[in-house]
Regions:
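N-terminal strand-loop element at the rim of the active site
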Residues: 5-17, 24-29, 42-94
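Conserved donor-binding/catalytic core segment of Leloir-type glycosyltransferases
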Residues: 21, 226-248, 254-258, 270-277
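Active-site proximal beta-strand in glycosyltransferases
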Residues: 118-120, 133-154, 160, 206
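Aromatic "clamp/platform" in nucleotide-sugar-dependent glycosyltransferases that forms part
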Residues: 347
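A short, well-ordered alpha-helix in the C-terminal region of glycosyltransferases
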Residues: 407-423, 435
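Membrane-proximal helix-turn-helix segments that form the acceptor-binding/catalytic region
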Residues: 148, 160-181
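Nucleotide-activated donor-binding/catalytic signature segment of Leloir-type glycosyltransferases, i.e.
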Residues: 274, 278, 283-330
């Protein structure tokens, strides 16, 4: 059965609840942080008292809800343990910082004073056994964005593989101390089951989809020159929004676009926009590779790095491919307003928030028929799902969209918007999370064993030592 048929709205009503305590290592502005913030705000809107504990939250580099008083964010354990040692040992430092935070807020009585109803933890599972030891009557929901052992890079090195062995083991073992594990898609649930078959037998795994903000109005005041260029109607726009990383397979969009006969590409632009950091070697290298690929297909291309009116107005009229590096939100809004089709090229994407943003903006989506998009996009209804190995199939969809009557596109856009609003809004996410919490709260918790493995005892000693050093 197709996973997309399993997505159903969740009903519920706001009601007073107890305290829910979140633990997240670093509240920056990434996708995991956006999910945590949305989950916390959503539960708060359902009547829960919510507190987030974190090792780090820079007011200048976090989401508004974390600094404007919407959420109660408490920072502990930021020192003396660093985030890394000479840009290495990152996972070890993260675990030690997390354990230090746990012990510190327990010794100070801060955590007990909250009388937590449940813990929600994500990214780092190593502290779960300690939580069960210190608070045996408080259930834990662990949100697994994706198995860390599958994300860790550099495993080609024998030394790196050896270094990762204990952390890979700790990841699986410690997740067994949660009462339930939540994941971001049916696809990720399948990956978790295959990666840790033993965990599946011990812990229930639930799907809690990430969300997009369906309530805020787009601010067009800062769009300015971007609207003049992209939403002017001078070109039909095929849009891709993704980080400039090889795993995103942006080249697929270029190849499919190049396969459209030249006569049908007249008056059409392929816009490749997304995250880019000149300090990241892969971003720089992949952008150069994509430029070379465009040139090899005789496609005129132009790169934009500044988005003021002057820079945008200087885009050559004969450029059929545009590379937009590190676009601001106002430009992203203009691009979605102008796009006839959003092309989402990654294969086996864990979830994929960009297709939801496009559908909310009433833009049909063409995506790979693997991973999370299979669950969010309804094929031939809100977009198309195609084999990422079949360039011609992608090119054919592009050609069909370019020739499709505007009324048909508008209907697909309306269907996409309705799907996102009914299934992937923040309230729906909060209700799914709330249902998961209610389920684990209804179960009688088994007391943890009296003695944990030596590794946990050592970790506690290290954390206590770190707290002692901090208090000196």
């Amino acid at each position: 059965m197709s996973p997309q048929g399993d997505v159903q709205p969740v009903s519920g009503s706001p009601q007073p609840q107890g305290t829910v305590v979140f633990f997240h290592p670093d509240l920056g502005i990434g996708g995991a942080e956006r999910l945590v913030v949305d989950a916390a705000v959503g539960l708060q809107e359902q009547g829960h008292h919510v507190v987030i504990f974190t090792n780090h939250c820079d007011p200048g580099h976090c989401f508004d809800e974390c600094r404007d008083g919407t959420l109660d964010v408490r920072v502990h354990g930021a020192w003396p343990i660093p985030m890394s040692i000479f840009n290495r040992l990152t996972i070890l430092c993260a675990i030690l910082r997390h354990l230090q935070l746990l012990v510190q807020i327990t010794l100070s009585g801060e955590l007990q004073a909250l009388k937590p109803r449940a813990f929600i933890v994500d990214q780092l599972s190593a502290g779960l056994p300690v939580m069960r030891f210190l608070f045996p009557d408080t259930p834990i929901l662990f949100y697994c964005h994706f198995p860390d052992l599958l994300l860790a890079q550099g495993r080609q090195s024998a030394l790196k593989r050896l270094y990762r062995v204990p952390f890979d083991w700790i990841e699986e073992w410690s997740m067994g101390f949660a009462q339930a594990v939540a994941v971001n898609s049916e696809f990720t649930r399948g990956v978790v089951a295959r990666t840790w078959p033993g965990l599946k037998e011990k812990v229930d795994t639930k799907v809690v989809y990430p969300c997009v903000d369906t309530t805020s109005k787009q601010d067009d005041s800062s769009a300015g020159g971007a609207d003049d260029v992209f939403a002017s109607g001078d070109y039909k726009t095929i849009l891709s929004i993704n980080r400039f990383e090889r795993k995103k397979d942006i080249g697929l969009a270029l190849k499919a676009f190049a396969a459209i006969p030249e006569a049908q590409r007249k008056g059409v632009r392929l816009v490749l926009a997304g995250g880019y950091d000149h300090r990241v070697a892969e971003n720089v290298e992949y952008h150069a590779e994509l430029q070379q690929l465009a040139s090899s297909h005789s496609l005129n291309h132009h790169t934009v790095t500044s988005f003021d009116a002057s820079s945008l107005s200087s885009i050559p009229s004969d450029a059929s491919v545009l590379f937009l590096l590190s676009i601001p939100n106002s430009v992203k809004t203009s691009l979605l307003r102008a796009a006839r089709l959003l092309v989402y090229t990654p294969s086996n994407e864990h979830f994929g928030i960009v297709p939801l943003e496009a559908m909310l903006a009433r833009v049909p989506v063409l995506a790979a028929n693997t991973g999370g998009p299979v669950e969010t996009i309804r094929d031939s209804k809100t977009g198309w799902l195609r084999d990422p190995e079949d360039v011609n199939a992608w090119s054919n969809v592009m050609r069909d969209v370019l020739g499709m009557p505007d009324d048909n596109l508008r209907q697909m856009g309306a269907d996409g918007e309705e799907r996102v609003r009914s299934l992937f809004g923040r309230k729906n996410m909060a209700l799914r999370l709330e249902a998961s919490l209610d389920e684990i709260l209804a179960k009688r918790l088994a007391r943890p064993p009296l003695f944990f493995p030596i590794g946990i005892v050592v970790s506690l000693v290290l954390a206590a030592l770190a707290v002692y050093m901090q208090l000196q």
